[in-house]
Amino acid sequence: MIILLLIYNLLALPIIISLSIIFSIFNKKIRKGFLGRLRSISSLKSFNSEKFSDIYWFHSSSYGEYQQVETLIHKLKKSDPNIGIIASFFSPSGFDNVKDDNIDLKIYLPFDFILTSYKALKLIKPKKIFFTSSDFWPSFLFVANNLNITTILTSARYRNSYKIFLNMFDIILCVSENDCQLMKRNIRNNKITVTGNPRYDRILNNLNNAKYKIKSDIKEKNKILILASMWREDNKIIFEDLIDSSLINHFEKIIIVPHEISQKYINYYCSSFEKRNFAYKVIDNYQNFEHLAEKFIIVNRVGFLSKLYLQTSITYVGGGFSKSGIHNIIEPAAASNPVIFGPNFLNSNKLDAQGLINVSGGFSIESFNVFKE
């Protein structure tokens, strides 16, 4: 393990950081993350951790992963308002879009060198560190273990390639009994338990608190299609053929939510509609679709996608034509939407996808022609 960490710190990380510097010149998202990590230690130095009884550090890769621990953070703060919560992120989608009064400090996770991780953890001295899903970093974990800081993995799923990292956690909270049994058979840890998928609690809470809901009979009559978490591949295979087909006439409205909210993608959708003289509207706040005259709606903000499903009748979830795999399909299913997605669902959402397919609530497609059917 020590040898692997040395190779990682002395060879792999410098190469990764060098490439990040180069790519950041051309990619705004990479640049924001890189500059944010440069400021992380300074932010930790300025943070007054002494005024809190204990510090709990939560790390999530992105906005979606943070939502999986959001309920836990709220419960911790409610049970003891004197504790401090630090939330760290890898992606700008998490850092920029998570706005939660329960968080006392929000940062990018510092560069994963052993010395940097040691400096960060000695400054804060957290009582516990929570990692969400699969975004865990070797040096940070190693240092936490050596400083006797309790490390907890939430929303855990077993993958053999993660085995070396899974052995570094003190407590592992699995999303399913199957994952739990695989963990117990393959790693050295007796503190493994099933807590279920925390996304479900959050989904139900969002649905219950949604302001705008359309009754099921109206949803069925006035069909509203939502294309959610759309990647470039989804645009090429589904979106472009859809807007050139007669299928659009079957829908009262069509909502488009890009996976990455950026001006580049918004301009792409706007241009596509303008070329065809289609009326469209770009929205950046949660609102009632019934009050919008335009047929095509482009969503230009994250944070309320799960609530939009209550106003739609059919959902296409993107990612299934890309290497990353499909995104959250439970949210639209919970809102009684049939869910359509591409062929690549062998990621962390595999069990959800297969479960929906088995009960005819989900449909995997390989082309737009199948989508039309």
Predicted regions and their residues:
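Anion (oxyanion) recognition and catalysis
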Residues: 77, 145-146, 274, 333, ...
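Donor-nucleotide binding loops and adjacent catalytic segments primarily
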Residues: 75, 81, 86-90, 95, ...
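Helix-enriched interaction subdomains in cytosolic or periplasmic regions
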Residues: 1-33
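Catalytic binding pocket for nucleotide-activated donors in carbohydrate/polymer assembly enzymes
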Residues: 169, 310-373
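Active-site and donor-binding regions of nucleotide-sugar-utilizing enzymes
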Residues: 20, 24-207, 226, 230-232, ...
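Hydrophobic beta-strand scaffold residues
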Residues: 149-151, 280, 339
